Regions:
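Alpha-helical segment proximal to the catalytic Tyr-Lys
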Residues: 53, 97-101
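Residue(s) in the substrate-gating loop at a strand-loop-helix junction
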Residues: 68
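Substrate-binding pocket helix/loop in short-chain dehydrogenase/reductase
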Residues: 24-25, 32-37
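Active-site loop immediately N-terminal to the catalytic Tyr-X3-Lys motif
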Residues: 26, 75-79
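Active-site helix of classical SDR
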Residues: 48, 84
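C-terminal helical subdomain
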Residues: 108, 124-159
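Conserved NAD(P)H cofactor-binding loop of Rossmann-fold oxidoreductase domains
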Residues: 16-21
Length: 186
């Protein structure tokens, strides 16, 4: 769905705070939940609340939230990260519904794997790994097109979206097979 395009003189706020710990379910802790949700969700929502009065008073501008394809569906090692990004995706959709009629653009950036210090923690294959430069180019292109959701690389992100249409048992089987991660602790 197309939204507001970003042009040179637009006011754009990008919320890109995030933290990630690769955790399996048996490694879950209340501390990991608090820290991840505080950064990935509460921090972003609070910062959005702080900037919204200015944008609404201006009647223009845009907000971009950085989610993740990990928010599309349950994935091994994304025990807290995935749900935090799923909530952020939902938040961006709500913002778009409420703010776009008032002249405020809302963008959701859902990258696949991008080579960063956070993804360097992963001990598994990361399909379609992007450089930060490739990610930046995809984001700028998405802003220019006025895409609500800017997701990349397309082949990878579209495959993950299609998996969500499958019955859950088939989804689980395919994810386990693709990742090689099964529910047995080491």
């Amino acid at each position: 769905k197309r939204g507001r395009r970003i042009v040179d003189d637009d006011f754009l706020v990008v919320f890109n705070a995030g933290t990630y710990r690769p955790l399996r379910a048996w490694e879950l802790s209340a501390q990991a939940v608090r820290e991840t949700l505080e950064t990935n969700l509460v921090g972003t929502m609070s910062a959005t609340a702080a900037v919204l009065p200015t944008l609404l008073a201006q009647g223009e501008g845009a907000i971009a939230l950085v989610g993740s394809v990990a928010g599309y569906g349950g994935l091994p090692k994304a025990t807290v990260y995935g749900p935090s990004k799923a909530a952020l995706i939902n938040f961006a959709e709500v913002l778009h519904l409420d703010l776009s009629p008032r002249g405020i653009g809302v963008f959701l950036i859902d990258p696949g794997f991008v080579a960063t210090p956070l993804t360097a923690q992963n001990d598994f294959a990361m399909p379609a790994l992007q450089t930060p430069e490739q990610a930046a180019a995809a984001i700028v292109d998405g802003f220019a097109r006025g895409d609500f959701e800017i997701h990349f690389p397309k082949r990878f992100t579209r495959a993950l979206k299609l998996l969500q249409l499958l019955p859950r048992p088939l989804y689980f089987a395919l994810i386990r097979r693709a990742t090689g991660l099964y529910g047995v602790p080491p």
